Each structure stands twice: as C-alpha cells, then as structure tokens.
C-alpha cells in the first residue's frame, strides 16, 4: 500500500486521488506498525502556514512550487486569503516584499484556464514598461502549468503587433495606462466590461506620473461587479480618494512595520544651523559610523543628492544615489550596488525611496527633518529589523524644533534637553548617570553638535568646494530648491510653535561625552555664557554710574525694575506650571504681588481630585491628530485617512505642481491633486513622457485591411452587452434581481445609444467654440467687404494679375508716379511715354495720363 510522499503537496492543496482504493489508503494504518496518535495532525500542522492551506488548485500550486516559494511572506499571508474570498483590497507594501505574487497567485487561481469566448478577464496596470515587463515574466512563471494567455500592452512597441495579440483573445492584459487609453480610443471593439479582476500595481507611482485622469477613464469603462486590488508603498491623499471612489468596501492591508519604531532603534537628535550640516554629516560618516555599516541619507531635493554625491566622491567616499527624476536604468544600477554592499552609503529623496525595500540597514541620517511624524517613522522603519540594532541620526535646526515636538507627541515619548556644560562641570558623574537612566527608560535626549568639530571640518569642506567647479555650480540651485521646499512642506501645529519658545537651552549631546575633555568643556561653557549674556542695566544707567553723578532718574529706574521683575517672574512661573492646580500658585502669591498682577479682581480657584478627575482631552489626542482620523466618516474612510502620507516632491516642477495652478478653461487658479496635469491640447501622457491625442489615427483600420482580422474581445450583439464578472450567475439592477441568460449576456435596451447629457466642461467648451466661430465669421465678412470695395475702385483694370492680386503700377506713364493702375495719375517723369508705362525718352510731362 502506497504511502504519502512528504515532498508532494498535501491532499488539500494537491491533486485529488483518482481511485477509491487510493483514497482509502490515507485512513488505513501501515501493516506491522500501529499508527501513532496525532501523527496525521502533526503533518498537517507543520504545513498549515504554507501555500497548502490556501486551497490552491494543482496547476497553480505547481507553479508556486516551481517558482521557489515555500512559505508566504507577511503581505502574502495577509492579503491572499482576502483576495481569494473576493474582497477589494487596498494594500501597502514595499518593493521586494512579495506583493506581486500576492495578486498574481489569486488571479491565476480564479481564471485557471483559457476561455476564448469570455474576453479580457484580468487587467493589471503598471506605472512603467519595465515593471510591466517584469510582472509579465513573473505571471508566465507562475502560470506555467496553465493555458492562460497573457498580453503585454506598453509604450515603445508597435501598435500592429499589439493588435495581433489582442485579436487572440487574451485572458490577462498587463498594460501601462497611456498605451491602454490609446488602444481604447483606436479600437472600437475593445471592451473592458468583461474584466472581473483589476490590479493597480505601484498605485502611488501611477498617481505621481500624472496618470490620474487616465485611471479614472479606465475605471469608468470597467464593470461594476469587478474585484479591484490596489497595491502601493505609500498612500497619498489623492490615492485615498481614488480608493474610496473605485473600491467597493475595501479591506485595508498593511504591515505593522510603519506603525511603530523598533525598540532596538536608537534616536539621536542634533541641534545645529543649516550651514553646519555638511560638516556634521561628514564627521558622522567618517568618525561615528563604521565603514562596515550601511547608511541611507534622506535629503529634501534632487539637487542636494547631486551635491552630496560629488562632495563625497571628492572626499574619497563612493555613494549610491536615487531621486525621482533619475533614469530608471541608472537608479536600478545604483540600488543594485548598494544591495550587493559594493557601496555603503545611499543618498535618496523621499519620493525615490518610496517602496524601496533594503534589508539589514544599520543607520539612517535625516539631513532635513521630516515634516510629518508618519514620514519620520516611514524613514527610520527601515533600520533595526529582524532583531538587529540601528541608529537614526537627525539634524534639527531652530525652525525644526516645532516638528520635533510634534513627533514626540505622536510617538508618546518624553523629550528632554541634554545637560549644559555648566551642569556637567558641576556634577559630571551625576549628570551622566541621570542621562543614562533617561535613555534606558525610553526618553529622547537632544543636544548640540560640538562647535570645535564643526569648525575643524568646515575649513576642509570650503577648500574642496572652492576647488570643484561642479560644487560651485550646484550651490545656488541647492539654496533655491531648499527655500522652495520650506514653502511647500506642511506647517507644524500652533501648540508646538508656542511651546518651542519656552524650551530650556540644551547642552552638548551625550554621544560626544568621550570626545571633549574638561578644558574644552570649560571653554564651551564660557562661550555659551557669552551667547546668553544680557545686561541688567540700560545704557543710560551704565553711563550715569560711570560718571559717578547723583541722578534721580537712576533711582526711579531701579525701583521700577524691582517691581517689574517680581511681576515678570510670577508670570513666567505661572506659564511653566501649567499642570499644577491653580490654587497652589494662588497660595504662593503675597497680597501686594496679587494686587499688582491681578488688580482687584477675585482669583478663580478650583479643586481637582486626581483619582476621579476625567479630562476633556483624550490621552491619545496627538496620536489621532498625527493619523488624521476623522470621526464623522465611516470605518473604511478612517482607516484610509489614517494611512495617508503625502510627500513633498524632490524637484522644482513637482513642488510647484503641489501649489495652485492657473486653469486655462476655468480662467482662474485652482488647487490640483498630486500628479494632475493641466494641458490645453487635451493630450494624454504615456509612461515614456510622450504626449498623444486620444483620438483615432486610422492605424487599426489599416491593420484590418492588411491582415483581414479584427479584435472582438467583449463583443456586442445588437442590444446584448457582455456583463463583466462571469459567464453564469445573476446580476442586480435597481431593486430587482435578474438571472443571466444565454452565454452570460443579458438584453439592455438602447445599449449602443450614446448619452445626450453633457457635463459642464462640455457645455463650456461648446460655448467657447461657438464664440470663436462667430468671431471668425465676422472677421471673414470684414475682409470680403474690403475686397469688394477694392474691386469697385479698380473696375477698369485690364493688366495682368499676380497671385490673385492686382499689380500696383507706380509708373504707368514712363518715369512718372501713378498709384492707380488705369493710368489716371499724375506723371512727373522725364521723357515721353504712354499711359501704360512703356515709353522712354527725355522731356517733361505733366497732366493726367489717358489710355
């Protein structure tokens, strides 16, 4: 009796038994050995976490095993059961996390075999032709043991070859939006109503390339019964709105990597000036970060990426780089070098790093502080994975302190400044012990960069910049781009802006405690005291005391200062003690001080029992504000809004596109969504950047006449229209339920009649066209009236015509001037001549010429 081969798939995911004897063999124990208790259960339990438990058919499971998959990735484990159940999905996963197989395996499982009469049943939209080609190869490998036909529709290939592929009735189309819209405009018979499975791959990139309008056009041509899947690395606001409109009760699938910071990640915040960032970055890369550790550096614009790339190469460091406008081939080369550990530094922007999955990173450097807390978590979430430790270094300027407070309110982590140099000189061991305890408790300590180190490194950087013409040429573009970045990034909360003014002065960061000695600490303490020095006397008082003269106004100023200093100290004390009960502050104020501060008004006193007190502000207020959760919307909308993350573009054109733009049709400035384009020609933009008009060019008809073939996917028969999801089953229209008849077709009255209802844009365009026609007719009538008047004045002209116009004969009577072609002008020339101007000779002639 045959035993089950452990290497073969289980009975649930593999091929079913063909005979009853083989089916009974599973339940009979082996002869000579009793079956151990729980033996079969242990085998099923060992494979319960793999693809065997997903109920895949034999062909699909063999393709998965042939590809080399054994255990599903986290995104596959979460998304595939929901997709197989028929739900719409909005999933957020980085590149390299296995998301391609997460939607390809359920698609092949659903289609299984080729159906020539069903039309196009699956559609996958990719932002670039490279990604579409990669998806095609992946789908062919997974569907190796099926007879499904897959067609690739991307720009750069000939339309005729793609017509031939579409004429073979493919089951799956992998396309870029620009070329697909071109096919829909060219081929009338190409119908997407039969599509039942739609995937928007790298949806955030689709929107950033300006393909929003094309995606909406494609979405309107699909059936309402389709299953829509949306995979993205991040979720911009425009993409969230698209998901609300295009997905039906979507399930939000996201990994927990972006929701929290790893406990093994160390945070280091350095306060410095903007011009000191170069020196601080070079010091960190050379001295603090090991050469065996991989580091990713986030900057704001592509100009900073190019500047740092040249600077590092001048300093003997070879980095990799990536930004949004970079060529795809060059970007892949740089990323491959970094993944292969040929380079240890990667300089990127937020737009280029979106969806980038690089395992085993050691350090992250934030050159510019992220404007949103979720963006900070998105950056540093790449470090300290899989039990490894890592460090996130962040440069903080004075303008970024409010963002620092917003971040720690979002993370619910306490923030404290590093002890000053004076405090360290008084009790260095006690302060160091205090800081170590704070760091062990999860608190964040921020401090200054040593000024001596910055001054030393800055001198070398200036010499390098002055000796490199490329760096000199990039300085001004970097400055201008950074100013534009500051204008376009979101503002911090007003509460954090107000609290920044009351923050105490920070000292040297604890990471540099071993770098400086006691003498250098004393020098730094002295310089900090000079910075904070404020004279206690006005210039008049100082001059009066220097003159050693008695002046009654000096005594008045001293008394005034004594009174006002007490009041000022009380106000500062009141502002600093916000969380203490008000009655404690009232008890500490004497009668005369209370009179000076509050006047004769009675002080409002309150009593608060901390055990039973319920605050009107929730404890997770800042977390909810950071996630932008709206309570007045549904649960799905809240989950989508909580995942929204808009990124500031890394180049000037993208930053300007995020601001208001002048709309040529509305004749006013409008706010555009991310990735929208305003074009006056009505052209569509393909993934290669080419602009095409979405109108017929006659290519399809020429191909039909040449090959005598046609594309009949999604055929229509008179009033019958193919109804999307499946060839059998039922559909619902209004409140009445109908059963599908005859090969999945149902009768729809007037299905081919175009709609006569025009939208406001069409009405406005027709009015403008009508006004232009009227103006053109008026202009034409004015020209005709002038021409008729000219003909009337020149009736007796019998001379030659040139280009349909009368020749102006300036000398009809010899050398005389005559501006009328009939010879009735005055002649002032010498010699004899007739009225036709053919005479020669000498003499004077005055008078009117006659014919």
Swiss-Prot record:
Gene Ontology molecular function: ATP binding; ATP hydrolysis activity; RNA binding; RNA helicase activity
Gene3D superfamilies, per the entry: P-loop containing nucleotide triphosphate hydrolases
Hydrolase among keywords: yes
Biased amino acid composition, Basic residues: 733-746, 841-851
Family assignment from sequence similarity: Belongs to the DEAD box helicase family. DDX54/DBP10 subfamily.
Compositional bias annotation for Low complexity: 7-20
Stated name of the protein: DEAD-box ATP-dependent RNA helicase 29
Biased composition, class Basic and acidic residues, residue ranges: 24-42, 773-787, 796-825
GO BP: rRNA processing
Enzyme Commission identifier(s): 3.6.4.13
Database matches in SMART domains: DBP10CT, DEXDc, HELICc
Superkingdom of origin organism: Eukaryota
Positions contributing to ATP binding: 93-100
Domain Helicase C-terminal: 277-426
Enzyme class: hydrolase
UniProt-listed InterPro entries: DBP10_C, DEAD/DEAH_box_helicase_dom, DEAD_box_RNA_helicase, Helicase_ATP-bd, Helicase_C-like, P-loop_NTPase, RNA_helicase_DEAD_Q_motif
Stretches assigned to the Helicase ATP-binding domain: 80-253
Keyword Hydrolase: yes
Matches recorded under SUPFAM superfamilies: P-loop containing nucleoside triphosphate hydrolases
GO cellular component terms attached to this protein's record: nucleolus
């Amino acid at each position: 009796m045959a035993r089950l081969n452990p290497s073969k798939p289980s009975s649930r995911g593999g091929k079913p038994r063909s005979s009853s004897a083989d089916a009974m063999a599973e339940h009979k124990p082996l002869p000579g050995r009793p079956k151990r208790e729980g033996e079969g259960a242990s085998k099923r339990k060992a494979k319960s976490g793999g693809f065997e438990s997903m109920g895949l058919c034999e062909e699909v499971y063999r393709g998965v095993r042939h590809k080399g998959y054994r255990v599903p990735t986290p995104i596959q484990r979460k998304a595939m059961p929901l997709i197989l159940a028929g739900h719409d999905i909005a999933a957020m996963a980085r590149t390299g996390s296995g998301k391609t197989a997460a939607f390809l395996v359920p698609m092949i499982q659903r289609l299984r075999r080729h159906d020539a009469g069903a039309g196009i049943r699956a559609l996958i939209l990719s932002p670039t032709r490279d990604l579409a080609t990669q998806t095609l190869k992946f789908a062919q490998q997974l569907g190796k043991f099926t007879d499904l036909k897959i067609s690739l529709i991307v720009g750069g290939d000939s339309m005729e070859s793609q017509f031939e592929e579409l004429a073979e009735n493919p089951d799956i189309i992998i396309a870029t939006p620009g070329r697909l819209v071109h096919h829909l405009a060219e081929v009338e018979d190409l119908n997407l109503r039969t599509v039942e499975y739609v995937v928007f791959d790298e949806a955030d990139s689709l929107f950033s390339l300006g393909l929003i309008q094309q995606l909406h056009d494609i979405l309107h041509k699909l059936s309402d019964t389709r299953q829509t899947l949306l995979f993205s690395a991040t979720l911009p606001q425009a993409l969230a709105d698209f998901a609300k409109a295009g997905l039906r009760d979507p399930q939000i699938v996201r990994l927990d990597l972006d929701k929290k910071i790893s406990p093994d990640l160390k945070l280091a915040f350095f306060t410095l000036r903007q011009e000191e960032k170069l020196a601080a970055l070079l010091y960190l890369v050379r001295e603090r970060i090991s050469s065996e550790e991989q580091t990713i550096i986030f900057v704001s614009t592509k100009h900073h990426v190019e500047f740092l790339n040249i600077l590092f190469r001048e300093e003997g460091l070879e980095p990799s780089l990536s930004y949004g406008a970079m060529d795809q081939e060059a970007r892949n080369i740089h990323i491959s070098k970094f993944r292969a550990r040929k380079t240890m530094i990667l300089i990127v922007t937020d737009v280029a790093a979106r969806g980038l999955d690089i395992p085993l990173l050691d350090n992250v450097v934030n050159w510019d502080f992220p404007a949103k807390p979720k963006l900070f978590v998105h950056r540093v979430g790449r470090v300290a994975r899989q039990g490894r430790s890592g460090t996130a270094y962040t440069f903080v300027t004075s303008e970024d302190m409010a963002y620092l407070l917003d971040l720690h309110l979002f993370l619910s982590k306490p923030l404290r400044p590093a002890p000053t140099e004076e405090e360290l000189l008084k009790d260095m061991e006690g302060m160091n012990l205090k800081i170590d305890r704070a760091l062990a408790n999860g608190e964040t300590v921020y401090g200054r960069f040593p000024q001596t180190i910055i001054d030393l490194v800055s001198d070398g950087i200036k010499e390098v910049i002055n000796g490199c013409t490329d760096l000199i040429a990039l300085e001004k573009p970097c400055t201008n781009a950074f100013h534009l970045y500051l204008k376009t990034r979101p503002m911090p909360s007003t509460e954090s802006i107000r609290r920044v003014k009351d923050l105490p002065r920070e000292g040297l960061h604890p990471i540099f405690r071993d770098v400086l000695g006691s003498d250098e600490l004393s020098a730094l303490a002295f310089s900090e005291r000079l910075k904070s020095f404020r004279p206690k006397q006005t210039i008049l008082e100082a001059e009066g005391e220097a003159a050693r003269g008695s002046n009654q106004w000096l005594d008045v100023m001293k008394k005034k200062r004594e009174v006002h200093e007490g009041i000022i100290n009380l106000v500062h004390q009141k502002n600093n003690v916000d969380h203490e009960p008000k009655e404690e502050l009232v008890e500490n104020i004497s009668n005369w001080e209370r009179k000076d501060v509050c006047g004769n008004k009675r002080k409002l006193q309150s009593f608060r029992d901390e055990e039973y007190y319920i605050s009107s502000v929730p404890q997770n207020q800042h977390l909810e504000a950071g996630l932008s959760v709206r309570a007045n919307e549904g649960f799905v909308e809240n989950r989508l809004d909580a995942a929204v993350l808009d990124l500031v573009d890394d180049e000037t054109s993208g930053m300007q596109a995020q601001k208001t733009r002048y709309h040529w049709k509305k004749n006013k400035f409008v706010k555009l969504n991310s990735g929208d384009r305003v074009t006056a020609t009505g052209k569509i933009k393909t993934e290669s950047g080419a602009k095409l008009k979405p109108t017929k060019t006659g290519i399809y008809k020429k191909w039909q006449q040449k090959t005598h073939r046609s594309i009949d996917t999604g055929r229509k028969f008179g009033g019958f229209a193919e109804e999307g999801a499946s060839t059998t089953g039922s559909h619902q229209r209004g409140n009445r339920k109908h059963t599908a008849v005859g090969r999945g077709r149902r009768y729809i009255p007037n299905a081919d009649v175009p709609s006569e209802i025009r939208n406001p844009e069409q009405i406005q365009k027709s009015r403008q066209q009508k006004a232009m026609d009227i103006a053109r007719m008026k202009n034409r009538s004015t020209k005709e009236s002038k021409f008729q008047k000219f003909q009337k004045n020149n009736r007796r002209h019998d001379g030659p015509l040139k280009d349909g116009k009368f020749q102006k004969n300036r000398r009809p009577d010899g050398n005389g001037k005559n501006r009328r072609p009939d010879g009735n002008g005055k002649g002032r020339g010498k010699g004899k001549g007739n009225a036709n101007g053919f005479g020669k000779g000498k003499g004077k002639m005055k008078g009117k010429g006659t014919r």
